[in-house]
């Protein structure tokens, strides 16, 4: 009997504490539900493409050939541009990277509706196969040649040989410059034979091998030609020794002088 009374007393003593815990748990649950609802509403609002579309473009970089209009045009080809939350940056970057003059594109989103684009352009080093351009690494790109400012050497070669031809021009042109000449065109044909056209119009046939020796042979011959060099059409150096010299016809030379 005493035990029963004691137990009942304990229950009576604890009941306010139990109620307090129950109220606290209920309040905490309500707060969680409110926070969850608010978070869900916020995320849904941020992902709603009608509310926060990426609609502004900021273009940065030292640019001479790429404009904001170029970037807008390639982005307009996408099915759609999402929101700050939903848009995949890689998709934007791949699209902008397709612009012919763009060497590298770095893109990030800025809250709430802005796309920031930083571009690095290719730097022209040479013309390639009459319809493309090369950068300093021998990378081929297809920028609009008509927009290129300045004079550049014309390089030609089979697919995949651009770095090799560019290196050859860099190696040999300084040697010609010592005689006051410059390489205007450098050609590596399909048979892997080399041809040089100088800025004074002389064409050099060098063949496939012994380029250093054949070019050195040309230098000796050119010094011997003196003033007669302007009468030379081509020099064929594809021999073990010596060279074959092709001369302009006398009539053609006379016509050129009259034109001057």
From Swiss-Prot:
Segments in the Cytoplasmic topological domain: 1-26
Periplasmic-facing ranges: 48-260
TM helices/strands, residue ranges: 27-47
The UniProt record lists the keyword Cell membrane: yes
Subcellular location: Cell inner membrane
Main location: membrane
GO biological process annotation, one example: division septum assembly
UniProt domain POTRA: residue ranges: 52-122
Pfam families for the chain: FtsQ_DivIB_C (PF03799), POTRA_1 (PF08478)
Sorted UniProt keywords: Cell cycle, Cell division, Cell inner membrane, Cell membrane, Membrane, Transmembrane, Transmembrane helix
InterPro entries: Cell_div_FtsQ/DivIB_C, FtsQ, FtsQ_C_sf, POTRA, POTRA_FtsQ_type
This protein's GO CC annotations: cell division site; FtsQBL complex; plasma membrane
Membrane topology: Single-pass type II membrane protein
Assigned protein family: Belongs to the FtsQ/DivIB family. FtsQ subfamily.
Subunit structure: Part of a complex composed of FtsB, FtsL and FtsQ.
Protein function: Essential cell division protein. May link together the upstream cell division proteins, which are predominantly cytoplasmic, with the downstream cell division proteins, which are predominantly periplasmic. May control correct divisome assembly.
PANTHER family noted in UniProt: CELL DIVISION PROTEIN FTSQ
Full protein name: Cell division protein FtsQ
Species per Swiss-Prot/TrEMBL record: Vibrio cholerae serotype O1 (strain ATCC 39315 / El Tor Inaba N16961)
